[in-house]
């Protein structure tokens, strides 16, 4: 049910820090901070049962003051389980169970309990009395290259009132506090692949140099003619600029310059006239 997590998000208080040290290893879960939910629905003829668990990796949950207190977990609950039931001929699920797990300002983490030996990650476990029953839950944050979000492992009625949530995420990997981890290499690329900018290569393309040479050549031509007109003829103002006859020669000068530059790069040795 989305209404439960929306209520917790509305009153969520950010933890002062989402960094934890377990067995002298540092972890930073801030990338997945904030209330998250996971749910499942099972058939319990003639009804249906829906279970939802809300948790925040960085802080405890706060009540929504706009909702009745008995319809939500108490303040500072670490994981809140909510059970709903859909009766025959009814359209909407009705809240039937409120199961708080843990209490405190933030989760208390231990080394990862699941997965192969050496797998990076964290675990948090809680057991609470619930009516005449006792509830237990394990939440495992498992180091992974891919974010998968929280998932319930024992979907069902809860064997012996035990629930387990596994969350595979890059945030659960050990944080050494130094340089960031290298990005995952794309298939078919070598470590030296990439463009000039990513490799720090300051070289420019020959087309850029050609453009710069042309601009400088035109500027020198105009300034040179202006100086000649001023020094030789005493012209001023607009008369300093090259005359119309000179301007008509500019395209041909540029064409010849481009031809020479291209010939230099291509190594062309062709001479003579071109066919008309």
Swiss-Prot record:
Residues 16-175 form the MRH domain. GO terms for cellular component: cytoplasmic vesicle membrane; Golgi membrane; mitochondrial membrane; phagophore assembly site membrane. InterPro entries: Autophagy-rel_prot_27, Man6P_isomerase_rcpt-bd_dom_sf, MRH_dom. It comes from the Eukaryota. Coiled coil: none annotated. It is found in: Cytoplasmic vesicle membrane; Golgi apparatus membrane; Mitochondrion membrane; Preautophagosomal structure membrane. Its main location: membrane. The keyword Protein transport applies. The keyword Transmembrane helix applies. Residues 225-276 are cytoplasmic. Keywords: Autophagy, Cytoplasmic vesicle, Disulfide bond, Golgi apparatus, Membrane, Mitochondrion, Protein transport, Signal, Transmembrane, Transmembrane helix, Transport. The chain crosses the membrane at residues 204-224. Residues 174-198 are annotated as: Disordered. GO terms for biological process: autophagy; protein transport. Residues 1-15 form the signal peptide. PROSITE patterns: MRH. Disulfide bonds join 18-58, 73-80, 143-173. It is a single-pass type I membrane protein; Single-pass membrane protein. Residues 16-203 are lumenal. Effector of VPS34 phosphatidylinositol 3-phosphate kinase signaling. Regulates the cytoplasm to vacuole transport (Cvt) vesicle formation. Plays a role in ATG protein retrieval from the pre-autophagosomal structure (PAS) and is especially required for autophagy-dependent cycling of ATG9. Belongs to the ATG27 family. This is Autophagy-related protein 27.
């Amino acid at each position: 049910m989305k209404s439960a997590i929306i209520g917790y998000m509305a009153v969520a208080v950010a933890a002062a820090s989402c960094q934890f040290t377990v067995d002298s290893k540092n972890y930073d879960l801030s990338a997945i901070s904030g209330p998250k939910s996971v749910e499942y629905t099972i058939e319990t003829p003639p009804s249906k049962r829906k279970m939802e668990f809300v948790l925040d990796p960085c802080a405890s949950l706060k009540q929504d003051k706009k909702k009745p207190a008995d319809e939500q977990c108490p303040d500072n609950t670490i994981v809140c389980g909510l059970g709903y039931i859909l009766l025959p001929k009814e359209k909407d699920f009705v809240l039937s169970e409120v199961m708080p797990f843990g209490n405190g300002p933030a989760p208390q983490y231990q080394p990862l309990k699941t997965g192969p030996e050496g797998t990076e990650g964290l675990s948090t476990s809680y057991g609470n009395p619930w009516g005449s029953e006792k509830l237990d839950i394990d939440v495992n944050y498992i180091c992974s290259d891919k974010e998968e979000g929280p998932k319930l492992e024992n979907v069902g009625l809860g064997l012996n009132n035990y629930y387990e949530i596994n969350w595979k995420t890059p945030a659960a990997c050990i944080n050494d506090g130094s340089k960031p981890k290298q990005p995952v290499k794309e298939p078919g690329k070598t470590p030296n692949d990439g463009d000039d900018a990513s490799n720090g290569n300051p070289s420019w393309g020959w087309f850029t140099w050609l453009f710069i040479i042309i601009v400088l050549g035109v500027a020198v031509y105009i300034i040179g003619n202006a100086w000649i007109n001023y020094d030789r003829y005493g012209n001023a103002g607009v008369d300093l600029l090259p005359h119309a006859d000179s301007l008509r020669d500019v395209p041909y000068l540029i064409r010849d310059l481009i031809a020479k530059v291209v010939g230099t790069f291509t190594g062309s040795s062709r001479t003579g006239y071109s066919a008309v």
